[in-house]
């Protein structure tokens, strides 16, 4: 039935066939590589979890029941006072405080102890202004075109828009990046297990440390600005931004929405 096909048609079919064969070959090669990697990991099941680490005795502090109840309630009251703040004082914060906050975030658990996070701290005013420029440019498009009217309407009670003064008002910006994979000394990719979950948990530690230090922050997710911010601060293609936090003291006239948190019986299911 191909008797009437021209030489051009035969050439086109041959090209398509060659492309399909190449794609199938690539797929088979990739599947074989993954299978070999899995087989290698299974033959050394503890190598990734405990890479030549020594084990040491561990005896954390133990408190009486009365002290545990008091400490847990005190911590709850402190964290319950935490609010997302959009109005910052430009008053400076000691660098050592920020260093300690980042150290605390770095104590977070991570898959196979890969610690797949990078905390970029920006104090430089010109760089903060550039961050604001990038985010406001994308946020205006988000509000006007990308988010949809329902999302915009849901944000109206919080009185938010694409203007982000806090990005230049707050003394510090902390950008948290997840490392989707690591790079070994010889330039090979290193698997970072559960990198998004691990980095997200570290963000929780970070927020708790900020609250504990007597500072405030705003948890923001720079929608559609991630690659520009990554390039701005010189991070590699293996890193993706998770959250951006302006950090500092609240302004004297700071106000926050009068929001209420869900009671315990709405967030906990308990089996005694």
From Swiss-Prot:
It is an enzyme of class 1 (oxidoreductase). FMN binds at residues 82-86, 110-111, 219-221, 261. The keyword Cytoplasm does not apply. It holds the Pfam family Nitroreductase. GO terms for molecular function: FMN binding; iodotyrosine deiodinase activity. It catalyses: 2 iodide + L-tyrosine + 2 NADP(+) = 3,5-diiodo-L-tyrosine + 2 NADPH + H(+); iodide + L-tyrosine + NADP(+) = 3-iodo-L-tyrosine + NADPH; 3-iodo-L-tyrosine + iodide + NADP(+) = 3,5-diiodo-L-tyrosine + NADPH + H(+); L-tyrosine + chloride + NADP(+) = 3-chloro-L-tyrosine + NADPH. It is found in: Membrane. 3-iodo-L-tyrosine binds at residues 112, 139, 143, 164. Keywords: Flavoprotein, FMN, Membrane, NADP, Oxidoreductase, Transmembrane, Transmembrane helix. Its cofactor is FMN. The chain crosses the membrane at residues 5-25. Belongs to the nitroreductase family. This is Iodotyrosine deiodinase.
